[in-house]
């Protein structure tokens, strides 16, 4: 893929070009306004002709220049007149003097400036969006927008579907604000202590001079006003469909929500910037889903119970500058605690402190209960220390249990010998494959699958798949090429092996033989075909000649030919029958022809110009 940017300082992305083996197969051109608003995404084929496009419309534009912003950074008014405008909010000092800062209050109309309002699809149908501001406790407005309504229209402008959303418990419209606006969040306090030399009886002595309080005001809050990108979170969202006059029903979504835990203050009683414990990692999980029809009847419900696994809490110390010693004798700060005046003035330390925790772990589904079309089922899960499912218990409406137990690399590595395949997989971080899957009805074992891996030299890959009853290989991977593609596979119950030759640098199968092998070709030709960007006509002719090789009588050979974009161009069956595939300039299948050139399948795509 090739990315092309504008030559301006903004370096805005203008075009994406996609190549396959050096040949351009498609491109995307981005039409923008002022490099800030994407007006259209136009898709072109290999012939440089436009195939289809998406269009985007917005609610006007945000003010140009130095934008006025609210407490959360959203636009709240016309541009400021100067780049030197004071972005801190208005503040009143203890002596009732006011610092004339920027108006940081929320403005719903300006906050929606420049927001996406319409998407036009290649079919010329379109979707429109309506927004509203977030609402926290007691209906207080907060920065940021939430979707209020979505309308879907066809190409003729006829309304096809309408969705609208209600937020909060009992559709109150209110959620939980991450943090209320507090002037202290925009101000940090510290002190300056003057230290100077004065003559004494036995030489110069260090004296404490002026003690100055410094209030530093900031354009943005020192604390985070967002969680997962939002200033307000909602534990319940209800989606309606149809029209307000004739709703088709609704879907209620319920999500996990946990407040962060905060200290009351720092060691010196100041407001902390970081929560003692952040619970954001447990928030936003789907707790429940209920679908009702327009009569209020429940047609589907889902209820999830979660648990913490592998939790670790790491204690940290936040250190803030509280006092700085300056002046001719500022070196005193190295040993200030030995000077009573300075120690008293700094209350024993030049810094302020508080603790907080960083938590690791996962919040996973422990039990899921589902009701669908009158049928109930419950699924319970157990996990290992890597968060992988090791046991899944399904209980149906009749109370019957099916248990699936899984074992992974870490389960076998614990008892494995050094240098064994499990030891190699563990240290290469190959942890995701399930190596053993056992199925029980109640406590009776009814099925078992074992996946055996092998170190093939350059990589580790599957060798055998064994199943209960036979407990012999059901699928055996006998060899791979250098790209990790299987070249010989045998299956239990089938008396013939299947061999493959891969081409186009290991990206596509170019030949398949059943009941025989490609050994007569020799490793030199096979490796040359596999490694080539595109197999030569001469090499493909040698492979095709195997069809008449007496030593391969009874075997069945299928060959595959591809175009420069690696789309299947021709399929030659074991009996020699050829099927051809043709594509449009954007690489989509247009038609399928038999060996006589007759179209047997045709495809058309409904995009309006």
State the predicted function of each range.
Residues 524-538:
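Surface-exposed loop/turn segments flanking beta-strands in extracellular/periplasmic regions
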Residues 592-609:
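C-terminal tail/sorting-segment detector
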